[in-house]
């Protein structure tokens, strides 16, 4: 098959289909014998049945071409989420042997995550592999027999957390040292942690968003500049590992209590904000609310329940940090009033939010959460996504006013006007005009 040239003069109706594009780069190319994509008739993917009644019938996720993975892979995309490119760089620069066999000795979960019925339902969990923490052990024989690489997509561990705000809470008497959750007078915390990489079951994801699987595949293929041709050429493969950030679960108290409906649960679902969470920017309430959420989660654990904080990598409402900083510039140069808060984002990004909270509750169902006694979030989008997935929320806890930095009143008042929960006043559009952030030069 000869190469097909598509120029700017080629009519749109004459653009070749994916299958017409050459599948093997010729020896005249800098890269020899590179297979660009695969087709159902050329492959024998290892069976994978999402939502199967047992792990044996479910099967492992195979998402690499190494060994016999080219013919037998049953997932599109690559492991490690947004870090997959660094893995490729390590291989390309000869720092990593592509045939490296991971030794998972002693890397098994540091605590048992109670198995849930939701793990075996193809609608309850569609954005993560519920068996991702067990795959190297459940499917070791499959890996050997089929000569394919099987990698975990979840890791479960324990740690000690040190935060200045928790030390302050101990010193001021808001938290007590109990030796179990709060370890010492420095406010060090015992915490159980779970890291999760995204794994999408495409039919389920499409259903959550109210689109067809074909529409979803087309958008994912075209809007990523054709990054994953198999989204188009492999309709038989239903699982996709997207190149996006994952999430981390932080559990305070006994992990078994999280799924116990007789125990109270305090929960904060937090979306990443590097500028505030890590570097203390006061233009938003992100770090103050996160620290308040952790403190309240610890208190619930000390009261005999459990506390959970889920941290999603969705920087800048999933618009990214570059877009977020451009919006900051536009806000500060344009007066930075609360009535224009969302409009400035829409002018630059075309949309105010791309976090798509519909997928967020999956990790809650994976943990076995059946109710939330205290929801440490004001977000109507998070609330609605959780409730829509059948998890009731008993009480919603807004951030205390004294924790809101002055420059972030623009953000919080605009969000309350748009539907965020509050026990206080909801400003109208005219009142929002009087809520103004400081300028770059107005720092005292």
From Swiss-Prot:
Looking up CDD domains in the UniProt record yields: GTP_cyclohydro2
Q: Which GO terms describe its cellular component?
A: cytoplasm; nucleus
How would you classify this enzyme at the top EC level? Answer: hydrolase
What Pfam families does this protein's entry cite? GTP_CH_N, GTP_cyclohydro2
Q: What is this organism's lineage? A: Eukaryota, Fungi, Dikarya, Ascomycota, Saccharomycotina
Q: What organism does this protein naturally occur in? A: Lachancea kluyveri (Yeast)
Check the record and name the InterPro entries matching this protein: GTP_CH_N, GTP_cyclohydro_II, RibA, RibA-like_sf
Active-site residues? Answer: 353 (proton acceptor), 355 (nucleophile)
Q: What does this protein do?
A: Involved in uracil catabolism.
- In this chain, GTP is annotated as bound at 268-272, 315-317, 377, 382
Give the family per the record. Answer: Belongs to the GTP cyclohydrolase II family.
Q: Which UniProt keywords apply?
A: Cytoplasm, GTP-binding, Hydrolase, Metal-binding, Nucleotide-binding, Nucleus, Zinc
The principal localisation class reads: cytoplasm
Task: List the GO molecular function terms.
Answer: GTP binding; GTP cyclohydrolase II activity; metal ion binding
The residue stretches assigned to a coiled coil in this entry are none
Q: What is this protein called?
A: Putative GTP cyclohydrolase URC1
**So where does Zn(2+) get bound?**
273, 284, 286
EC number of this enzyme:
3.5.4.-
Q: Name the gene behind this protein.
A: URC1
* Compartments, as annotated in UniProt: Cytoplasm; Nucleus
User: Which Gene Ontology BP annotations are present?
Assistant: riboflavin biosynthetic process
């Amino acid at each position: 098959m000869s190469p097909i040239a598509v120029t700017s003069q080629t009519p749109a109706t004459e653009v070749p289909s994916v299958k017409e594009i050459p599948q093997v780069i010729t020896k005249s190319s800098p890269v020899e014998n590179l297979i660009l994509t695969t087709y159902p008739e050329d492959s024998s993917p290892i069976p994978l049945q999402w939502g199967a009644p047992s792990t044996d019938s479910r099967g492992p996720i195979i998402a690499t071409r190494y060994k016999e993975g080219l013919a037998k892979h049953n997932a599109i995309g690559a492991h490690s989420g947004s870090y997959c490119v660094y893995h490729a760089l390590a291989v390309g620069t000869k720092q990593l042997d592509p045939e490296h066999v991971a030794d998972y000795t002693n890397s098994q979960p540091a605590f048992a995550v109670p198995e849930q019925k939701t793990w075996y339902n193809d609608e309850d969990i569609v954005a993560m592999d519920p068996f991702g923490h067990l795959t190297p052990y459940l499917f070791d024989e499959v890996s050997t027999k089929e000569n394919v690489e099987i990698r975990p997509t979840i890791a479960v561990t324990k740690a000690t957390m040190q935060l200045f705000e928790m030390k302050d809470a101990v010193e001021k008497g808001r938290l007590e040292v109990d030796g179990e959750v709060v370890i010492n007078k420095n406010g060090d915390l015992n915490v159980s942690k779970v890291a999760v990489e995204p794994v999408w079951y495409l039919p389920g994801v499409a259903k959550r968003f109210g689109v067809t699987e074909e529409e979803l595949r087309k958008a994912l293929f075209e809007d990523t500049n054709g990054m994953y041709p198999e989204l188009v050429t492999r309709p038989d493969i239903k699982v996709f590992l997207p190149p996006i950030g994952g999430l981390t679960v932080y559990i305070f108290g006994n992990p078994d209590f999280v799924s116990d409906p007789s125990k109270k649960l305090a929960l904060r679902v937090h979306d990443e904000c590097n500028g505030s969470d890590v570097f203390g920017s006061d233009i938003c309430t992100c770090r103050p609310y996160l620290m308040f959420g952790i403190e309240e989660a610890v208190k619930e654990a000390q009261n005999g329940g459990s506390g959970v904080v889920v941290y999603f990598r969705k920087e800048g409402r999933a618009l990214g940090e570059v877009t977020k900083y451009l919006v900051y510039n536009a806000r500060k140069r344009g007066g930075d009033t609360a009535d224009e808060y969302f409009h400035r984002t829409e002018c630059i990004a075309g949309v105010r939010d791309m976090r798509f909270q519909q997928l967020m509750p999956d990790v809650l169902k994976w943990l076995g959460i059946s109710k939330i006694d205290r929801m440490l979030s004001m977000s109507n989008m998070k609330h609605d996504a959780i409730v829509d997935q059948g998890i009731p929320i008993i009480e919603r806890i807004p951030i205390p006013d004294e924790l809101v930095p002055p420059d972030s009143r623009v953000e919080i008042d605009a969000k309350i006007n748009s539907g965020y929960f509050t026990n206080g006043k909801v400003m109208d559009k005219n009142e929002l005009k009087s809520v103004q952030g400081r300028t770059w030069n107005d720092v005292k």
